[in-house]
From Swiss-Prot:
Any one of the GO BP annotations: protein maturation
Free-text function comment from the UniProt entry: Serine protease that initiates the alternative pathway of the complement system, a cascade of proteins that leads to phagocytosis and breakdown of pathogens and signaling that strengthens the adaptive immune system. In contrast to other complement pathways (classical, lectin and GZMK) that are directly activated by pathogens or antigen-antibody complexes, the alternative complement pathway is initiated by the spontaneous hydrolysis of complement C3.
Recorded catalytic activity of this chain's protein: Selective cleavage of Arg-|-Lys bond in complement factor B when in complex with complement subcomponent C3b or with cobra venom factor
InterPro entries: Peptidase_S1_PA, Peptidase_S1_PA_chymotrypsin, Peptidase_S1A, Trypsin_dom, TRYPSIN_HIS, TRYPSIN_SER
Signal sequence extent: 1-21
Peptidase S1 domain segment(s): 27-254
Lineage of producing organism: Eukaryota, Metazoa, Chordata, Craniata, Vertebrata
Keyword Hydrolase included in the entry's annotation: yes
PROSITE patterns associated with the record: TRYPSIN_DOM, TRYPSIN_HIS, TRYPSIN_SER
Ways its activity is controlled: Circulates in plasma in a mature but self-inhibited form. Activated by factor B (CFB), which displaces the self-inhibition loop. Associates with CFB complexed with complement C3b.
Hydrolase found in the keyword field: yes
Protein name (database record): Complement factor D
């Protein structure tokens, strides 16, 4: 049964059965992004409905969050590239089928660890000013605390469930892991494979899962889809550190190319 408290639910008909795909996460306290200024952004969709964010890392691969597959069931998984508005016609927009969906082998439904997903598009994306891959961090280093990083998405933008049609974004300062692991914050659960950003009324959340945390023009992290209270300063946003997964990402894409 669809949740009527304000969170968007996309009903997916599977024969006689009805499943619910909910958009994972939201941008709280942000603003509309400049049109097509983030040409790497992807909308991961099930039966034409946005459920997660993602970003283009090569002509044929999109990186997202493993938990996003929980919303797929037997629905049709696709990726929308070149979009600013989800509903309005735009010359750069194109919807791609997914040839392969590869979650990290150690990802689990009950944990945010290893929350990564690689999606191979059915064909190479048509690159242009509004569609471009994003560089991602390959060197194992820590982003200094206080660094302002950009996060964007199409998730709902308020606790009342209002959902934007156009891409939203905000800047968030990175929070050091020691502070993020304090008992009053995430109580030791943040590993070296994760990073945190402050979340005082400005936050990414489950609905923007899979989108990139971009610092200095490079994707340093991916929005996780773990359940938590969004916009609560005592529960900072958690992101999967890409530098910890270079071998896995390269390996998946190389194996697929060789197949």
């Amino acid at each position: 049964m669809a949740d009527r408290s304000g969170h968007l639910a996309a009903l997916i008909l599977l024969g006689a059965a009805v499943c619910v795909a909910q958009p994972r996460g939201r941008i709280l306290g942000g603003q509309e992004a400049k049109s097509h200024e983030r040409p790497y952004m992807a909308s991961v969709q099930v039966n034409g409905k946005h459920v997660c964010g993602g970003f283009l890392v090569s002509e044929q691969w999109v990186l997202s969050a493993a938990h996003c597959l929980e919303d797929v069931a037997e629905g049709k998984l696709q990726v929308l590239l070149g979009a600013h508005s989800l509903s309005q016609p735009e010359p750069s927009k194109r919807l791609y089928d997914v040839l392969r969906a590869v979650p990290h082998p150690d990802s689990q439904p009950d944990t945010i660890d290893h929350d990564l997903l690689l999606l191979k598009l059915s064909e190479k994306a048509e690159l242009g000013p509004a569609v471009q891959p994003l560089a991602w961090q390959r060197e194992d280093h820590e982003v200094p605390a206080g660094t302002l990083c950009d996060v964007a998405g199409w998730g709902v933008v308020s606790h009342t469930g209002r959902r934007p049609d156009r891409l939203q974004h905000l800047l968030l300062p990175v929070l050091d892991r020691t502070t993020c692991n304090l008992r009053t914050y995430h109580d030791g659960t943040i590993t070296e494979r994760m990073m945190c950003a402050e979340s005082n009324r400005r936050d990414s959340c489950k609905g923007d899962s899979g989108g990139p945390l971009v610092c200095g023009g490079v994707a340093e992290g991916v929005v996780t889809s773990g359940s938590r209270v969004c916009g609560n300063r005592k529960k900072p946003g958690i992101y999967t550190r890409l530098a910890s997964y270079v071998a896995w990402i390269d390996g998946v894409m190389a194996d697929s190319a060789a197949a």
